[in-house]
């Protein structure tokens, strides 16, 4: 029996790499990357500039995928704030073009959005909460969510929380946290930034669940609302380190290009009902480190 084709953008990125691994069980996976010399076992790697409209159109027509997961993004809020044109080209224009081509093929397109579409003033946020971004990254993700839905009735928005884990071609914040602690250096962490984090492995499973179940919007946060500082305390526990190295601070103490919402905890009750099963932060960290 011929397996269906799944096209994943951002395959060399943190989330995309986890998606490629998880999707191979049920799909023939084709992964878009923005550079050559990348090997992801078990998938067909397709180098492409997603901002090149004609190249993307040709690829979609040649590949004829059965579904698409759009995980490629400029995802660092400070970088987006400092480079608005680049952010718009990748996070908005490329997303809308991809949704248009998926609409023409009448196939589902899962879009990985973010908890940064909210202002942090009324958590926790469920799927029906009004969007209210306070930084450019969030604004561009809102534009992409809306525009993709207009271009493809089969578009599925997955709003992602803070994610952590290990991937060969991209890092999450976890590596820098762990490296700092293991080097015996102090680690400053915000007490006033609250998220609902999950591992990259868990996030990938949630996105594939969304593709299978087909809701128009799904939040994929974890079960715990936790600050970065308290996350650090759990990390220290898992790594058998010392909390002495942790230094509490607030967002106002660190100059940043992009404003940050204080509490963008996601209410992921709908995903839980559909079978999404993220573990506690401690359990997820133990899984990441193979403990």
At which residue positions do the language-model features occur?
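Mid/C-terminal beta-alpha module of Rossmann-like enzyme folds, strongest
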Residues: 206-207, 212-257, 289
């Amino acid at each position: 029996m011929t397996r269906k084709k799944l096209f994943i953008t951002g395959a060399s990125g943190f989330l995309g790499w986890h998606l490629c691994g998880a999707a191979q069980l049920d799909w023939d996976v084709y992964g878009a990357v923005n550079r050559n010399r990348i090997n992801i076992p078990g998938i067909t790697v397709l180098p492409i500039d997603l901002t090149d409209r004609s190249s993307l159109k040709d690829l979609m027509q040649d590949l004829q995928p059965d579904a698409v997961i759009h995980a490629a993004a400029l995802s660092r809020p400070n970088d987006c704030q400092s480079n608005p044109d680049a952010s718009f080209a990748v996070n908005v224009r490329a997303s809308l073009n991809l949704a248009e081509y998926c609409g023409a093929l009448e196939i589902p397109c899962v879009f990985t959005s973010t908890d940064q579409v909210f202002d942090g003033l009324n958590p926790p946020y469920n799927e029906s909460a009004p969007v209210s971004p306070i930084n450019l990254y969030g604004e561009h993700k809102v534009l992409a969510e809306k525009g993709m839905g207009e271009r493809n009735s089969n578009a599925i928005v997955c709003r992602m929380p803070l994610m952590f884990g290990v991937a060969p071609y991209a890092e999450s914040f976890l590596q820098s946290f762990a490296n700092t602690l293991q080097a015996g250096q102090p680690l400053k962490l915000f007490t006033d930034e609250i998220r609902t984090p999950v591992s990259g492995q868990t996030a990938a499973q949630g996105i594939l669940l969304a593709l299978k179940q087909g809701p128009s919007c799904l939040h994929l946060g974890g079960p715990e609302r936790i600050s970065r500082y308290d996350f650090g305390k759990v990390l220290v526990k898992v790594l058998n380190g010392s909390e002495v190295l942790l230094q509490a601070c607030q967002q106002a103490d660190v100059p940043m290009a992009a404003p940050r919402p204080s509490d963008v905890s996601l209410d992921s009750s709908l995903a839980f009902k559909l079978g999404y099963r993220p573990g506690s932060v401690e359990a997820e960290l133990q899984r990441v480190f193979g403990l």
